[in-house]
């Protein structure tokens, strides 16, 4: 992300469900009504992921709500959207995705300093159930430490 960015949506489950190994930024192909919906905050990327199809990267399962003023020119809320990346970046991603168990997860959607919509993607590997339990224990222990320190002073 650059100097200024306005985060519109975040995938908070991603850091809990996956080990994020690498992060990258990609542009996204949108229709006019989709852009207006994103500006109004009607977007969710909870279960969205990116995958390769015919040497291009597409974003699946992302939700961008309908824009009410667009009437008949409105878009489909859950459609497959093309991501804009350089050819070398796409080849690098395809190489990394060939590793077993790796996936490309959408981490956030934001406006960059030039007011363009960008998607932050994370190359992720799934966590096992015991990894998730360990993460929960760690979070609770940190909260408990903070409470103890607060009561000490």
Swiss-Prot record:
Subcellular location: Cytoplasm
Main location class: cytoplasm
Name of one Pfam family that matches: SmpB
Protein name as annotated: SsrA-binding protein
Originating species: Orientia tsutsugamushi (strain Boryong)
HAMAP family, per database record: SmpB (MF_00023)
GO cellular component terms given for this protein: cytosol
SUPFAM superfamilies linked to this entry: Small protein B (SmpB)
Single Gene Ontology BP annotation: trans-translation
Protein purpose: Required for rescue of stalled ribosomes mediated by trans-translation. Binds to transfer-messenger RNA (tmRNA), required for stable association of tmRNA with ribosomes. tmRNA and SmpB together mimic tRNA shape, replacing the anticodon stem-loop with SmpB. tmRNA is encoded by the ssrA gene; the 2 termini fold to resemble tRNA(Ala) and it encodes a 'tag peptide', a short internal open reading frame. During trans-translation Ala-aminoacylated tmRNA acts like a tRNA, entering the A-site of stalled ribosomes, displacing the stalled mRNA.
Family matches, as InterPro entries: SmpB, SsrA-bd_prot, SsrA-bd_prot_CS
Family stated for the protein in its record: Belongs to the SmpB family.
GO molecular function terms noted in the UniProt entry: RNA binding
Keyword set, alphabetical order: Cytoplasm, RNA-binding
